[in-house]
Design a protein with these regions (language model features):
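Single-stranded nucleic acid-binding surfaces, predominantly the OB-fold ssDNA-binding core
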Residues: 1-89
Length: 89
């Protein structure tokens, strides 16, 4: 699996800092990946839906730890680049 494109929409909310869409292998897109500011810094939250009990359940997510780490690093790098570009404007 290769992430071939990342698009970031910057947000300036208390915890929500951005929303990403990624393209995998130039043929599959995942939207609404959130960039969140947590207690220990930035992290990526996969698209999710609230169930009947009020808990959030991921709609799509990596199964392997290595894949999750790669996805998070790629999205956070794109977020930081988008933030730098926005500050330069």
């Amino acid at each position: 699996m290769k992430i071939t494109d990342v698009r970031i929409r910057l947000k300036d909310e208390e915890k929500l800092k951005g929303i990403a869409s990624i393209t995998i292998d130039e043929c599959f897109v995942v939207h609404d990946i959130k960039v969140i500011e947590g207690r220990d810094g930035l992290f990526v939250s996969m698209p999710n839906k609230k169930n009947a009990e009020g808990a959030h359940k991921d709609i799509a997510h990596p199964i392997k730890t290595e894949t999750r780490m790669e996805l998070q690093a790629t999205v956070l790098n794109a977020y930081k680049k988008a933030l730098e570009e926005a500050k330069a404007e």
